Curated annotation (Swiss-Prot):
One of its GO terms (biological process) is translation. The modification N5-methylglutamine is found at residue 152. Belongs to the universal ribosomal protein uL3 family. This is Large ribosomal subunit protein uL3. It comes from the Bacteria. The gene is rplC. GO terms for molecular function: rRNA binding; structural constituent of ribosome. One of the primary rRNA binding proteins, it binds directly near the 3'-end of the 23S rRNA, where it nucleates assembly of the 50S subunit. Keywords: Methylation, Ribonucleoprotein, Ribosomal protein, RNA-binding, rRNA-binding. Part of the 50S ribosomal subunit. Forms a cluster with proteins L14 and L19. Disulfide bonds: none annotated. InterPro entries: Ribosomal_uL3, Ribosomal_uL3_bac/org-type, Ribosomal_uL3_CS, Transl_B-barrel_sf. PROSITE patterns: RIBOSOMAL_L3. The keyword Flavoprotein does not apply.
Amino acid sequence: MKGLIGQKLGMTRLFDKDGVSIPVTMIEITPHRVTQIKNIENDGYCAVQVTTGMKNFKHINRPETGHMIKSGVDAGRGVWEFRCEEAGMPQLSLGDIITIQIFKNVKKVDITGISKGKGFAGTIKRWNFHMQDASHGNSLSHRAPGSIGQNQTPGRVFKGKKMAGQLGNYKVTVQNLDVVNVDVKLNLLLVKGAVPGTIGGNLSIKKSVKINIREKM
């Protein structure tokens, strides 16, 4: 398995043996239950589908209920899947349990989550634009973005132009976070630094795919 789903509990700090404070995020990773094994013959790709947490069957729809009953597992708070290479497909069966133990010897992880939504924001907050003059004849345009185009040619606003709009509530991945501690008894993963999302939000935690060149040297 390349990764698991965790729930953000919040941030705290730890002290190393030299007394240096390390900011860490606490992530709870409860045992996962395998709900489906996907393969190239039936699905066109290889993946392991899992669920975690608990949910009453009366709170999920009939197709989901049937899927869980067919897999022989209790309903969870959601369903996720992790793709695998055909050659490296783990030997798992429906109903198998996967725990935080898979991160025991992992040093770095990539974490994906939905960032905090901040609503409609202007260009200064959203894109770090410079403010216009506070005085010197300027009025009503202190936080305005300025020109968004050229002239009759090209006669349009280019796609991707940085303007005001929705800020936050994006899918964000933070790469190469250091694993500080893996507590198997409490199902807790402690990683150095901040991760996207609110407390209680779901996070996808995977083993890092990129290698830090300096550490490799």
